[in-house]
Swiss-Prot record:
Function: Identified in a screen for mutants with decreased levels of rDNA transcription.
Induction remarks: By the zinc-responsive transcription factor ZAP1 in response to zinc deficiency and by mild heat stress.
Keywords: Membrane, Transmembrane, Transmembrane helix
Membrane topology qualifier: Multi-pass membrane protein
Keyword Transmembrane helix (UniProt): yes
Protein name: Regulator of rDNA transcription protein 1
Length: 103
């Protein structure tokens, strides 16, 4: 019964997770392209895509969702934003906007 309940909720959580990633990627690329930073937009897309795949398969939060712990569903969906990917993403944005132009 627990397995069935979790299999019902898992697709909606994964769809929400993927849609958050895609919407942010599209928005940031739109800003970068309109500011004529085509190379930065391409590098950002590639970097963000790799980080998303890494987070999806290796993040402890995602593993806990897939391990069928029903009481963890709501917390896991909220805790996705606390993944190490966010820290790397912020670092990458700072590097692109501050350090990269000075090189």
């Amino acid at each position: 019964m627990i397995l069935f309940k979790n299999l019902v909720f898992l697709p909606s959580i994964l769809i929400g997770y993927i849609s958050i990633r895609v919407s942010l990627l599209v928005w940031v690329n739109w800003v970068l392209v309109w500011s004529s930073c085509f190379q930065v937009a391409f590098i950002f897309s590639l970097w963000y895509f790799i980080l998303s795949i890494y987070t999806f398969f290796y993040s402890k939060k995602i593993k806990q969702i897939i391990s069928y712990e029903p009481s963890y569903f709501v917390f896991s969906y909220r805790a996705i934003d606390l993944c190490p990917e966010r820290v790397l993403l912020y670092f990458f944005c700072i590097f692109n906007n501050v350090v990269f132009p000075m090189l």
